[in-house]
Amino acid sequence: MKVLGIIPARYNSSRFSGKPLTDIAGKSMIQRVYEQAKKCELLSSVFVATDDDRIFESVMEFGGQVKMTTEHNSGTERCNELAQNLEEKFDVVINIQGDEPCINPEQISQLATLFSDEDTAIATLAKQIKTANELLNENTVKVVFDENNFALNFSRFPIPDPKSFDAEKWFVHNNFYKHIGIYGYRTRVLQEICELEQTEREKTERLEQLRWLENTYKIKVEETELESHSIDVPKDIEKLNL
């Protein structure tokens, strides 16, 4: 099985412009993500996908593989364009978030391994939520899944809704999980989901994976114990343990 790792990267972000090129202890964010991804032995190849010349040149300078794409609304669409245009073809594409400079290669391996099951079309990771602050944070996407570990729903709001219990009992009555924003797709499925129309639920929650669920695509969810730290605003860099 040939697995392609793609790191979609755009320069402009509403909360952190130029994020991929921000310096983190002497290396750009995109370089740190790329180097972590390269440590995953299950990836046959790793590319950065961008529509920005500055990011392209930066990746070339540190010796990484990079391809220019057209503008896209999502990293998923950017991954699809790159995967379809490469001469070499891959069975699975892993969409690696470009704002997680400390991503653990074991998380990528954990996700890639799920595709040894031929029934896995799309896959992602989740980690149990332990605090009320994290549960109530709208930047933390929550996921619920069935007994076979297929996603039932994603939301920026707590699911299931814990408000019928006092706050101190929330974690007694339910397990809550946050979505780790790394995806794997079979290459043919990636192409299919990028041709789907946006749905109203997707627009409301600003979560593209709801479009896939509403179109009956199954998303396998694997629980991980490994923490994930995304950089949403500049002050998040101070929290990194480098």
Label every model-predicted segment:
Residues 2-49:
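N-terminal glycine-rich phosphate-binding loop and ensuing alpha1 helix
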Residues 5, 46-48, 93, 123, ...:
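Hydrophobic/aromatic residues located in beta-strands of well-ordered beta-sheets
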Residues 47, 53-110:
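Short phosphate-binding loop-to-helix
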Residues 50-51, 103, 185, 232:
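A conserved hydrophobic position in a structured secondary element of the catalytic/binding core
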